[in-house]
């Protein structure tokens, strides 16, 4: 009982923080954290099978920064940035890869000019100018995580110095937003217009990829006007944690408090091509979605954690939709 009470107080203190939007949207690399990390991500996709993804993570002077910049054109294949884009700049910038806020909390510009590599290993020239436009306010995951379930997971764990050191990874600030991605990509002098559904996230705090066991992260939008994000993560020092939200067509936001577990989603295949996930909401509602993976962008984090960002089609409460399907696994523990 004492552990349970202490755990609930710990979670309550962590989840009570609220930062102004103009502060949230800045880069935060706190060198006092065990594993400093500021990570942001943009994704876009359309029903024709075109997709775009970019991510930057700034991790302090002692760890290598992370970068993703990849896209798929349905008739041309996959292209991506395979070499370091350059030194960290002011704000969200690594070399020629740059993101700039146009309107805080709503609109961001993504630009890149340089080389990308195709599936055949050949280099191509690329110029990118995209705008992400949010459809609703940013959603802080501190509002959606079920504090009772988190406290239960903490209380049931063995408490020692190592546990509390690793627990700092769960104290990140993390928010997301769905919307649209528009603009153009010029590939080898040919301009391709981009008009996609989009999603973005931003998190900062401490992150040590080697303590992650496995996870999935699902985000998308249905033709009926629902958009959603749900994630469930299992660490090697802590049980499964779940968070997420559903934005209804009228703009009402409902928090995800539980979802189908990792083992059930992957019962037939560790990296499933499709599966059904049930969402339990704070309002008492439930939603059912089925995803279908259509190719993916692979990444490896800190040489240990495998990430697969898949182009996704959905049925959300039986209505068609599209989005992104992310699965991750610790390479020492799982073999695909």
Predicted regions and their residues:
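Structured soluble/peripheral alpha/beta segments that form catalytic or ligand/cofactor-binding pockets
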Residues: 1-336
